[in-house]
Amino acid sequence: MAKQKFDRSKPHCNVGTIGHVDHGKTTLTAAITKTLSTKGWADFRAYDQIDNAPEEKARGLTIAISHIEYQTETRHYAHIDCPGHADYIKNMITGAAQMDGAILVVSAPDGPMPQTREHVLLIHQVEVPAVVVALNKCDMMDDEELLELVELEVRELLTKNSFPGDEIPVVRVSAIKALECGCGKRECEWCGRIWKLMDAVDTYIPIPPRPVDKPFLMKVEDVFSIKGRGTVATGRVERGVIKGGDEVDLVGLHHEPRKIVVTSLEMFHKILDTAEPGDAVGLLLRGVEREDIERGMVLAKPGSIKPHVNAEAEVYVLSKDEGGRHTPFFNGYKPQFFFGTTDVTGEIHLPEGVEMVVPGDHVKMKISTIYPVAMEKGMRFAIREGGKTVGAGAISQVLA
């Protein structure tokens, strides 16, 4: 069968369901597809089709993720759902499936639980910009006052983690009832609530700025000099656009950022006018010697990113079964940090009261590198030892 053409007429947005185990994330995902399928905007995916998620590799980690596609009247969505708690943690930290917004599923009879709190903290740390709440299993709650108390508790949890808890939409649903009914009508007591939830997602989760609108960034992968022409740096454009004549900052590793000019761009030995995100390009640079630039540095829009040696990070430590360490590590552990294209030696500083980190843990820590690296909030990295990945991290705050 011929592949369908990707429809670009609706703006695209990435969302995911998050929340405590057994609060109904996967059932809700199934209910969303069932309801939208009545309009022809989704293929219905049953619970067990979503739950046996295929495994993916990201930064040396195996993560089980289900990718579901659906549309509403105004948007096209890619929706991710993970079967296990650890899969969510790993996905958020590695950014394997980036989320522009999250649907936080909280079971009304139970209220926020430990994993609810952990997920909310993490989406704040890795900069998921917006959240909509699905208060699930409302068919099991007769007491309106109790429902209001649970809603208040969820709002307080969001506020505590720097989200606007008072204004975030909280929609009361019963995923199982909507699935059982399946009529998909807006006036239906249960299917109508799924529509209400999707309306909230449509209006409250913003369409992300396209990478072309963000400040230019390219991590340098290789460098060579062309006799009589100058120095060429190659890499993949991560965000923003660049054209011949633009000034960029060369950031990281040994000295303060310095300004250089991109004289021309090439891709597959052809001259380019402009390069966009995803393009693997060679940039011909003026005002820089071959010796002054190396793999691991970045070229960026002037002033947009700075080199740092200290940062705070959220880190997931691989378990032994995932190919990680067999033993814990302690304060002062000195691994390699892999930022984009290079390994930098550094040191780990554990929070007060944390003696050691055991494989399989998710922990907040401070890291310091032996020389400055271009870092910014939300940036992902791997922790390596002896050439193998032992952890994955995301910068939650740059310090100095």
Curated annotation (Swiss-Prot):
Annotated region (G5), positions in chain: 174-176
PROSITE patterns xrefs: G_TR_2
E.C. designation(s): 3.6.5.3
Keyword presence, tRNA-binding: no
UniProt-annotated location(s): Cytoplasm
Region of interest: G2: 60-64
Region (G4): 136-139
Reactions it catalyzes: GTP + H2O = GDP + phosphate + H(+)
InterPro entries for the chain: EF-Tu_GTP-bd, EF-Tu_GTPase, EFTu-like_2, EFTU_2, P-loop_NTPase, Small_GTP-bd, T_Tr_GTP-bd_dom, Transl_B-barrel_sf
SUPFAM superfamilies membership: EF-Tu/eEF-1alpha/eIF2-gamma C-terminal domain (SSF50465), P-loop containing nucleoside triphosphate hydrolases (SSF52540), Translation proteins (SSF50447)
Domain tr-type G: 10-210
Cellular component, GO annotation: cytosol
G3, as annotated region: 81-84
Disulfide bonds: none
Binding positions for GTP per the UniProt entry: 19-26, 81-85, 136-139
Keywords, sorted A to Z: Cytoplasm, Elongation factor, GTP-binding, Hydrolase, Magnesium, Metal-binding, Nucleotide-binding, Protein biosynthesis
Enzyme class: hydrolase
Matches recorded under HAMAP family: EF_Tu_B
Assembly, per entry: Monomer.
Family stated for the protein in its record: Belongs to the TRAFAC class translation factor GTPase superfamily. Classic translation factor GTPase family. EF-Tu/EF-1A subfamily.
Function: GTP hydrolase that promotes the GTP-dependent binding of aminoacyl-tRNA to the A-site of ribosomes during protein biosynthesis.
Identification of the protein by name: Elongation factor Tu
Species assigned in the record: Dehalococcoides mccartyi (strain ATCC BAA-2100 / JCM 16839 / KCTC 5957 / BAV1)
Gene: tuf
